[in-house]
Amino acid sequence: VGVGTWTKIGLNNTDYNDQGAFDAVNNHFVAPVDGTYLFGATLLYKINASATARMRGRLVLNGTTEIRGSLGEISATHVSLATAIWLQTMVPLTAGDTVELQGYFRVADGYFAADHTSFWGCKVG
């Protein structure tokens, strides 16, 4: 992922998708019904060329609006395959709303480790 641009993170594996709410083609969660949903994510840093990268993550509603409480950043020195961000928030959704995971790097580019970056959501109310 390059520097200075929020990028939707493609997820390579679906561990649980019993209700079919995760759209793997478009890499986002689609609310099946109206309600309150709990979302979370883990982003694991993987070095490209420099450990000076500063990693951010967030959850985004319908491709444009950052969900309140979902933004996180690690601003200390990063260690490849050890530095991680954990995000968690709740949000009211209408059936058909989408939620996606986005990542961002400051200072230097980097990767989000595919085998340990995760995104999840469930209806709680």
Stretch-by-stretch model annotation:
Residues V1-G125:
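Extracellular jelly-roll beta-sandwich "head" domains, especially the C-terminal globular C1q domain
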